[in-house]
C-alpha cells in the first residue's frame, strides 16, 4: 500500500510542493523569504478579515470605527497593529526576495520572474488602498494625490480620475470601493502565488552558485522546513517586538487626525515602503513624466532578464557586478530617505541624481559590467 500523501490527489500536490520537493543542497537563508512572504500573506488575510468585521467603510464613521477597534474590541489593538506592521514586514521580505532574485540571477526563470513583478504591483496596489481605509489626514490626501496622477494620462486622464473616485473628489464612493478592492485583492494575490510556485516548480530552485544543481538535490522536508521555521521565528519576533513596543514607529502622526478636505498637511507622503518610488515621481518636474518614471521604477525589473549579458548566472563570482548591486541598494535607501523629506534644496537635486543613478545602474552599468567580466575571464 502506497503512502496516502503520495497517492491521494490533494495530498499529492502538497507533498510534491512542500515535502518531497527536490531542492538544491546549497541554498542559503536568502531563499527563506518566499515562505516568509506566504506567512505574511496569511497573517494579513486573517487579521484583515477580523478587522473587516468591525470596520465601516463610510466617510462619517470609518475613522471612528478604527478607533473603536483599538479601544473597545477584545485585542482589537493587536489586530490593527499586526495588520499595519505586518504590511511593513511584507514589504521588507518582498524587497529582500526581489534583491535575492537580482543578485543570484533567479530572473532567468522568466515566467516565475514576470508573475513576481505582477504580484509586486498587486501587493503595492493593495497596500495603497489599505492605507486609505482609516480615513485619517494622510489617508485622504494620499488617496487624492496618488489617484490624481491618473489625470496626467493624455485625453482620458480627467475622465479616468473621476471614474476611479466615483465622483468629483475623493469621497464616500471612493472609500467604499477601496475597501471592496482591498478585501478582494489578497485572494487574487493568493491565486497568483500558486501560479508563481507552479512555474518555479517546473524549473526547480536556483542556488547561490548559479550552476544547475540537478545532480545534488535534497528533499525539502525536513531540511528546509526546519530552516524556514527558524526564519519564521525570527521574523515573528521582529514583528511582535514592533507591534508590542513601538506600534506607531513606521506610521504617520497625521493619520491620527480625522480626514479634513479643507486642511492640507504640510508634507504629504506615503508609507515608508513607497518612498523610493515617490522620490522618483517627485524628481521629475513634469507630471506625465513623473508618472511614467514611477511606473518604470518597478517595471524596469521586467527588462533585467533581457539585459543579462554575463556568461555566469549569479553574481557570486562577479565582483564588478557585486559593487554595482550594493550601489543600487545604497541608491534605493537614499531614494527612500529623500521621499520622506520636503521638496526643497538640497533634497531636490539629491533625489534627481539618485533617480538617474537608479535607472543608469540597472539599464546601462550592470550590462556593461557583465560584458567587462566576460572579457576578464578570457585573460
Curated annotation (Swiss-Prot):
Binding positions for heme b b566? Answer: 97, 196
Query: Under what name is this protein listed?
Result: Cytochrome b
* Membrane-protein topology: Multi-pass membrane protein
PANTHER family per the record?
CYTOCHROME B (PTHR19271:SF16)
Provide the alphabetized UniProt keywords: Electron transport, Heme, Iron, Membrane, Metal-binding, Mitochondrion, Mitochondrion inner membrane, Respiratory chain, Transmembrane, Transmembrane helix, Transport, Ubiquinone
The GO biological-process annotations, alphabetized, read as: mitochondrial electron transport, ubiquinol to cytochrome c
The Swiss-Prot or TrEMBL record describes its family as follows: Belongs to the cytochrome b family.
Coiled coil feature spans: none
Q: How is the cofactor bound?
A: Binds 2 heme b groups non-covalently.
User: Primary place of residence?
Assistant: mitochondrion
Assembly mode: The cytochrome bc1 complex contains 11 subunits: 3 respiratory subunits (MT-CYB, CYC1 and UQCRFS1), 2 core proteins (UQCRC1 and UQCRC2) and 6 low-molecular weight proteins (UQCRH/QCR6, UQCRB/QCR7, UQCRQ/QCR8, UQCR10/QCR9, UQCR11/QCR10 and a cleavage product of UQCRFS1). This cytochrome bc1 complex then forms a dimer.
**What GO CC terms are in its UniProt record?**
mitochondrial inner membrane; respiratory chain complex III
Annotated a ubiquinone binding lies at 201
Q: Which Pfam families match?
A: Cytochrom_B_C, Cytochrome_B
GO MF assignments = metal ion binding; ubiquinol-cytochrome-c reductase activity
Instruction: Enumerate the InterPro entries for this protein.
Output: Cyt_b/b6_C (IPR005798), Cyt_b/b6_C_sf (IPR036150), Cyt_b/b6_N (IPR005797), Cytb/b6-like_sf (IPR027387), Cytochrome_b (IPR030689), Cytochrome_b_C_euk/bac (IPR048260), Cytochrome_b_N_euk/bac (IPR048259), Di-haem_cyt_TM (IPR016174)
Give the location in the cell.
Mitochondrion inner membrane
The residues that cross the membrane are: 33-53, 77-98, 113-133, 178-198, 226-246, 288-308, 320-340, 347-367
Q: Which Gene3D superfamilies match?
A: Cytochrome Bc1 Complex, Chain C
Domain of life here?
Answer: Eukaryota
Q: Gene name, please?
A: MT-CYB
What this chain does, per the entry, is described as:
Component of the ubiquinol-cytochrome c reductase complex (complex III or cytochrome b-c1 complex) that is part of the mitochondrial respiratory chain. The b-c1 complex mediates electron transfer from ubiquinol to cytochrome c. Contributes to the generation of a proton gradient across the mitochondrial membrane that is then used for ATP synthesis.
Q: Which organism is it from?
A: Rhinolophus pumilus (Horseshoe bat)
Which positions in this protein are listed as binding heme b b562? 83, 182
Miscellaneous: Heme 1 (or BL or b562) is low-potential and absorbs at about 562 nm, and heme 2 (or BH or b566) is high-potential and absorbs at about 566 nm.
Amino acid at each position: 500500500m502506497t503512502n496516502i500523501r503520495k497517492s491521494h490527489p490533494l495530498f499529492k500536490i502538497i507533498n510534491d510542493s512542500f515535502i518531497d520537493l527536490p531542492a538544491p543542497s546549497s541554498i542559503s537563508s536568502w531563499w527563506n523569504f518566499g515562505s516568509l512572504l506566504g506567512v505574511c500573506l496569511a497573517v494579513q488575510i486573517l487579521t484583515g478579515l477580523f478587522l473587516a468585521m468591525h470596520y465601516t467603510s463610510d466617510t462619517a464613521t470609518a475613522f471612528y470605527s478604527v478607533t473603536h477597534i483599538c479601544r473597545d474590541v477584545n485585542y482589537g489593538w493587536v489586530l490593527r497593529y499586526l495588520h499595519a506592521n505586518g504590511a511593513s514586514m511584507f514589504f521588507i521580505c518582498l524587497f529582500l526576495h526581489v534583491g535575492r532574485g537580482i543578485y543570484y540571477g533567479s530572473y532567468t526563470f522568466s515566467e516565475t520572474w514576470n508573475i513576481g513583478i505582477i504580484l509586486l504591483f498587486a501587493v503595492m496596489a493593495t497596500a495603497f488602498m489599505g492605507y486609505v481605509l482609516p480615513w485619517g489626514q494622510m489617508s485622504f490626501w494620499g488617496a487624492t494625490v496618488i489617484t490624481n496622477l491618473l489625470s496626467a494620462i493624455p485625453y482620458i486622464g480627467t475622465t479616468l480620475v473621476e471614474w476611479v473616485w466615483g465622483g468629483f473628489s475623493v469621497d464616500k464612493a471612493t472609500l467604499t470601493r477601496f475597501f471592496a478592492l482591498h478585501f478582494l485583492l489578497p485572494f487574487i494575490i493568493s491565486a497568483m502565488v500558486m501560479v508563481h510556485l507552479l512555474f518555479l516548480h517546473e524549473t526547480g530552485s536556483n542556488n547561490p552558485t548559479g550552476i544547475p544543481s540537478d545532480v545534488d538535490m535534497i528533499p525539502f522536508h525536513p531540511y528546509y522546513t526546519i530552516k524556514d521555521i527558524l526564519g519564521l521565528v525570527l521574523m515573528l519576533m521582529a514583528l511582535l517586538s514592533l507591534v508590542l513596543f513601538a506600534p506607531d514607529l513606521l506610521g504617520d502622526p497625521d493619520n491620527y487626525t480625522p480626514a479634513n478636505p479643507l486642511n492640507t498637511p504640510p508634507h504629504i507622503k506615503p508609507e515608508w515602503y513607497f518612498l523610493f518610488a515617490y522620490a522618483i515621481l517627485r524628481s521629475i518636474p513634469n507630471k506625465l513624466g513623473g508618472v511614467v518614471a514611477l511606473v518604470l521604477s518597478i517595471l524596469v525589473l521586467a527588462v533585467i532578464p533581457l539585459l543579462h549579458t554575463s556568461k555566469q548566472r549569479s553574481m557570486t563570482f562577479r565582483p564588478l557586478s557585486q559593487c554595482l548591486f550594493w550601489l543600487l541598494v545604497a541608491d534605493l535607501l537614499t531614494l527612500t530617505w529623500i521621499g520622506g523629506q520636503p521638496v526643497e534644496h538640497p533634497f531636490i537635486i539629491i533625489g534627481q541624481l539618485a533617480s538617474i543613478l537608479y535607472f543608469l545602474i540597472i539599464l546601462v552599468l550592470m550590462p556593461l559590467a557583465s560584458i567587462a567580466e566576460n572579457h576578464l575571464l578570457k585573460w
